[in-house]
Amino acid sequence: MSVKVLVLDIETRPSLVYVWRFFKENVSPKQVIEHAQIISYAAKWLDSPEIFYQDNRKEDDKDIILSLVSLLDEAEIVVAHNGDRFDLPQIRGRALVHGIKPPSPVKIVDTCKIARREFGFASNSLEYLSTVLDCKIKKGGHKKFPGFELWLECLRNNEEAWEELKEYNIDDVKTLEEVYLKMLPWITTHPNVTLMETAGDEEEICCPKCDSNLIHYRGYAYTNSGVYSKYQCQSCGGWGRTRYRINKRSEALLTNLV
């Protein structure tokens, strides 16, 4: 498959603010000293062993945003866990702050949203999913620097903390790729990669999820007005149907009104 699928995970640093007390504090814009920024990212192309990693140890994240925008501009599909609500909006927001033009629009596959919609897991976190799905690389917790301490030590320029952040970020991307591939046959809203592969000029019948030509027709799919051939992909396991209906007597067919 030559469709460019980017598996992506970003990490952000917290805002630095002045506050009067520890709890129940409403922070006004004037209290913000430094705004939250993207501190690192890890990314890889689907099925490629190469992993891209970059961190930002400065007070200005423009360089890392330029790198991210360049990757997004090259991608056709982006896989991210909670990407619709976190990763992509964070990148867009920081790009806007720096006056960077938007990349080419991409399709987003949000594995967190898919887990919430399609499955009844006790948790939709990447850590839990990697455990319950028995992934080879399970998302782990922090090691020497637990929780917020990791980000705090990175801001203090602790080299050990930066190394731990790098390992944490890269492992997240490896885990995310495996979770995505396990979920793939269940994703009913997945972009049609066959259409993207051929730019609409299909010469071979292939699975719209994984672009495999190992298609096994099994029965029929029905709507209120049509009958279609139904198939299962023998590579990813996903189900689909043909676009054209096979029932001919459409003029004599009635449908429900109320």
Regions found by a protein language model. Give the residues of each.
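Conserved RNase H-like, two-metal-ion catalytic cores of nucleic-acid enzymes
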Residues: 1-72
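Conserved DEDDh/DEDDy metal-dependent 3′-5′ exonuclease domain
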Residues: 47-132
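Acidic, Mg2+-coordinating catalytic module of metal-dependent nucleases/exonucleases
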Residues: 79, 128-200
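Residues immediately within or flanking Cys/His clusters that coordinate Zn2+
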Residues: 202-205, 230
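Short cysteine-rich clusters marking metal-coordination/redox-active sites
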Residues: 206-210, 233-236
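Short Cys/His-rich "knuckle" micro-motifs
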Residues: 216-221, 243-247
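Short linker/helix segments within small regulatory modules
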Residues: 220-230
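Short metal-binding segments enriched for Cys and/or His
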Residues: 234-256
